[in-house]
Swiss-Prot record:
Keywords: Ribonucleoprotein, Ribosomal protein, RNA-binding, rRNA-binding. It comes from Rhodococcus erythropolis (strain PR4 / NBRC 100887). This is Large ribosomal subunit protein bL20. GO terms for biological process: ribosomal large subunit assembly; translation. Signal peptide: none annotated. The keyword Membrane does not apply. CDD domains: Ribosomal_L20.
Length: 129
């Protein structure tokens, strides 16, 4: 059988790994073995964090909505409950955007939510009876 020479393929493979790891620090960007190992970890982290990003954005939206809601004398959970009772279907992403960029529209939604809540829920803590 003829001898198979793979120098070209091996060099191409190494070059592609080193090119992909060009932004890493130290040996991880210069030595093939270290670069290959780091590349595997990097892809794992990227996969994991693409999924984690969704939860992080949801937390950010909730924090923004809660801050704006408290500025309008209502808590986050009462706001969400009131919007559900008023049958207003606005997701948290849009609510957070309104809270940041359009305070008047957000205040209108807060008014809708407050109107939809039962009377004893709107009372401050300690005064409900």
């Amino acid at each position: 059988m003829a001898r198979v020479k793979r120098a070209v393929n091996a060099q191409k493979k190494r070059r592609s790994i080193l090119a992909a790891s060009s932004g890493y620090r130290g040996q991880r960007s210069r030595l093939y073995t270290k670069a290959k190992e780091q590349q595997l970890h990097s892809l794992t982290y990227a996969y994991r964090d693409r999924r984690a990003r969704k939860g992080e954005f949801r937390k950010l939206w909730i924090t923004r909505i809660n801050a704006a809601a408290r500025a309008n004398d209502i808590t986050y959970n009462r706001l969400i409950q009131g919007l559900r009772l008023a049958e207003v279907e606005v997701d948290r992403k849009i609510l957070a955007e309104l809270a940041v960029s359009d305070a008047e529209a957000f205040a209108g939604l807060v008014a809708l939510a407050k109107a939809a809540l039962p009377a004893d829920v709107n009372a401050p803590a300690g005064e409900a009876a």
